[in-house]
């Protein structure tokens, strides 16, 4: 493989689309806390002065949508009208209805193990050995930058920061191996009274340098910090936000393929979410077992059918065993039916709001990041 560049981006928790994702998942968590068997599809729209929460829910639980919404916005940091968006004064509109009985009859079964998929679709999981969390480096460090922005904003280190921010990191590769960072972009919302010089110095010294490994930076690395020169108007005032619009940020930063389905606001019966988590679990364990340096798995489903309609694996020439053997091992050691994968990863519980900012993958607090199958996969592969 020749020399090449690869870029991934991330956005902060205060980005309008991420506000929407977090509200949708906060509603989901509140419902699952009372009713683990609930069916939830919650979508959120945010714009200046308002939040619209809609979707379809089937549950025995009652939750206070308005209070959940305000609490989520408050925790993100939109707490004053001078930001253009205030958790305590924004309007909250509730347009949630019931899930279609046509979907219910396709999903629910007398035998829970035969629960059908909540929809058709294809999902991908991916892992590689570029980082210690077995994720691509560009998305890993793009997330780390905006996570650091949030930390220094909230702890007062840089008090002039505001919640909305974006990052982008370009890595240079030679023969598939990282040789450095070519470019870094970080744009952050800020108070009107901070100078561009102070902002650039603060971001470089407090956010960028502590996050990016020094061995990957050199005299030719390009830095673009608030390149427009001003980012005072941000959040829902600057752009409207919608649930599910940051699917590449949420996954692998473009280094793996994507089936198109978003995650936030969906309960585990929706394979868009749960099967993508299971696919990451499979791919990560294959790489952790040393069976490949890079692994991408695709699974697909038909609505109302429990068994996946297909499983395929690609190791990009890095596999230590055949891809046919890998598929056989996956079928032997992983449960990919909707009910089974929900049980395997313990997904029917309120763990989702934390996933809705800074990526769903590469964070070891989540069950689909465990590598507990690596040892048996390696043994059964004969390595």
UniProtKB/Swiss-Prot annotation:
<feature type="binding site">
    <location>
        <position position="239"/>
    </location>
    <ligand>
        <name>ATP</name>
    </ligand>
</feature>
<dbReference type="GO" id="GO:0005524">
    <property type="term" value="F:ATP binding"/>
</dbReference>
<protein>
    <recommendedName>
        <fullName>S-adenosylmethionine synthase</fullName>
        <ecNumber>2.5.1.6</ecNumber>
    </recommendedName>
</protein>
<feature type="binding site" description="in other chain">
    <location>
        <position position="99"/>
    </location>
    <ligand>
        <name>L-methionine</name>
    </ligand>
</feature>
<keyword id="KW-0630">Potassium</keyword>
<dbReference type="InterPro" id="IPR022630">
    <property type="entry name" value="S-AdoMet_synt_C"/>
</dbReference>
<feature type="binding site" description="in other chain">
    <location>
        <begin position="245"/>
        <end position="246"/>
    </location>
    <ligand>
        <name>ATP</name>
    </ligand>
</feature>
<keyword id="KW-0460">Magnesium</keyword>
<dbReference type="Pfam" id="PF00438">
    <property type="entry name" value="S-AdoMet_synt_N"/>
</dbReference>
<keyword id="KW-0479">Metal-binding</keyword>
<comment type="similarity">
    <text>Belongs to the AdoMet synthase family.</text>
</comment>
<feature type="binding site">
    <location>
        <position position="262"/>
    </location>
    <ligand>
        <name>ATP</name>
    </ligand>
</feature>
<keyword id="KW-0808">Transferase</keyword>
<feature type="binding site">
    <location>
        <position position="17"/>
    </location>
    <ligand>
        <name>Mg(2+)</name>
    </ligand>
</feature>
<dbReference type="InterPro" id="IPR002133">
    <property type="entry name" value="S-AdoMet_synthetase"/>
</dbReference>
<dbReference type="GO" id="GO:0006730">
    <property type="term" value="P:one-carbon metabolic process"/>
</dbReference>
<comment type="function">
    <text>Catalyzes the formation of S-adenosylmethionine (AdoMet) from methionine and ATP. The overall synthetic reaction is composed of two sequential steps, AdoMet formation and the subsequent tripolyphosphate hydrolysis which occurs prior to release of AdoMet from the enzyme.</text>
</comment>
<feature type="binding site" description="in other chain">
    <location>
        <position position="15"/>
    </location>
    <ligand>
        <name>ATP</name>
    </ligand>
</feature>
<keyword id="KW-0554">One-carbon metabolism</keyword>
<dbReference type="InterPro" id="IPR022628">
    <property type="entry name" value="S-AdoMet_synt_N"/>
</dbReference>
<dbReference type="GO" id="GO:0004478">
    <property type="term" value="F:methionine adenosyltransferase activity"/>
</dbReference>
<dbReference type="GO" id="GO:0005737">
    <property type="term" value="C:cytoplasm"/>
</dbReference>
<dbReference type="InterPro" id="IPR022629">
    <property type="entry name" value="S-AdoMet_synt_central"/>
</dbReference>
<feature type="binding site" description="in other chain">
    <location>
        <position position="56"/>
    </location>
    <ligand>
        <name>L-methionine</name>
    </ligand>
</feature>
<feature type="region of interest" description="Flexible loop">
    <location>
        <begin position="99"/>
        <end position="109"/>
    </location>
</feature>
<dbReference type="GO" id="GO:0000287">
    <property type="term" value="F:magnesium ion binding"/>
</dbReference>
<feature type="binding site" description="in other chain">
    <location>
        <begin position="230"/>
        <end position="231"/>
    </location>
    <ligand>
        <name>ATP</name>
    </ligand>
</feature>
<feature type="binding site" description="in other chain">
    <location>
        <position position="270"/>
    </location>
    <ligand>
        <name>L-methionine</name>
    </ligand>
</feature>
<dbReference type="InterPro" id="IPR022636">
    <property type="entry name" value="S-AdoMet_synthetase_sfam"/>
</dbReference>
<keyword id="KW-0547">Nucleotide-binding</keyword>
<dbReference type="GO" id="GO:0006556">
    <property type="term" value="P:S-adenosylmethionine biosynthetic process"/>
</dbReference>
<feature type="binding site">
    <location>
        <position position="239"/>
    </location>
    <ligand>
        <name>L-methionine</name>
    </ligand>
</feature>
<keyword id="KW-0067">ATP-binding</keyword>
<dbReference type="Pfam" id="PF02773">
    <property type="entry name" value="S-AdoMet_synt_C"/>
</dbReference>
<feature type="binding site">
    <location>
        <position position="266"/>
    </location>
    <ligand>
        <name>ATP</name>
    </ligand>
</feature>
<dbReference type="InterPro" id="IPR022631">
    <property type="entry name" value="ADOMET_SYNTHASE_CS"/>
</dbReference>
<comment type="subunit">
    <text>Homotetramer; dimer of dimers.</text>
</comment>
<keyword id="KW-0963">Cytoplasm</keyword>
<dbReference type="Pfam" id="PF02772">
    <property type="entry name" value="S-AdoMet_synt_M"/>
</dbReference>
<feature type="binding site">
    <location>
        <position position="43"/>
    </location>
    <ligand>
        <name>K(+)</name>
    </ligand>
</feature>
<comment type="pathway">
    <text>Amino-acid biosynthesis; S-adenosyl-L-methionine biosynthesis; S-adenosyl-L-methionine from L-methionine: step 1/1.</text>
</comment>
<feature type="binding site" description="in other chain">
    <location>
        <begin position="164"/>
        <end position="166"/>
    </location>
    <ligand>
        <name>ATP</name>
    </ligand>
</feature>
């Amino acid at each position: 493989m020749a020399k090449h560049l690869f870029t991934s981006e991330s956005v902060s928790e205060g980005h309008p689309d991420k506000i929407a994702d977090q509200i949708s998942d906060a509603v989901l968590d509140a419902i699952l806390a009372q009713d683990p068997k609930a069916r939830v599809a919650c979508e959120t729209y945010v714009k200046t002065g308002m939040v619209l929460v809609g979707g379809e829910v089937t549950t025995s639980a009652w939750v206070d949508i308005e209070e959940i919404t305000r609490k989520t916005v408050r925790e993100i940091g939109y707490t004053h009208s001078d930001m253009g968006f205030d958790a305590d004064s924004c309007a909250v509109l509730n347009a949630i209805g019931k899930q279609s009985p046509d979907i219910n009859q396709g999903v629910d079964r007398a035998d829970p193990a035969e629960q059908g998929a909540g929809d058709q679709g294809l999902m991908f999981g991916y892992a590689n050995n570029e980082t210690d969390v077995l994720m691509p480096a560009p998305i890993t460090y793009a997330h780390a930058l905006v996570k650091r922005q949030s930390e220094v904003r909230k702890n007062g280190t840089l008090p002039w920061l505001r919640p909305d921010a974006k990052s982008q990191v370009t890595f240079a590769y030679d023969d598939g191996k990282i040789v450095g960072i070519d470019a870094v972009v970080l744009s952050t919302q800020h108070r009107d009274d901070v100078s561009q010089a102070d902002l650039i110095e603060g971001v470089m010294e407090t956010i960028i340098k502590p996050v990016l490994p020094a061995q990957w930076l050199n005299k030719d690395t390009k830095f673009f910090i608030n390149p427009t020169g001003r980012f005072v108007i941000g959040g829902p005032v600057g752009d409207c936000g919608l649930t599910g619009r940051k699917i590449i940020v949420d996954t692998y930063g473009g280094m793996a393929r994507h089936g198109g389905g978003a995650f936030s606001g969906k309960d585990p019966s929706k394979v868009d979410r749960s099967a993508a988590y299971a696919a990451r679990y499979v791919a990560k364990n294959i790489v952790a077992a040393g069976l490949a340096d890079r692994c991408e798995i695709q699974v697909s489903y038909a609505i109302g059918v429990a068994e996946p309609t297909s499983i395929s694996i690609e190791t990009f020439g890095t596999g230590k065993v055949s891809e046919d053997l890998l598929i056989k091992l996956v079928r032997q050691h992983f449960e990919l039916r909707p009910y089974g994968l929900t049980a395997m990863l313990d997904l029917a519980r309120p763990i989702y709001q934390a996933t809705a900012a800074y990526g769903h993958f590469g964070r070891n607090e989540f069950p689909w990041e465990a590598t507990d199958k690596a040892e048996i996969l390696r043994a059964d592969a004969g390595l």
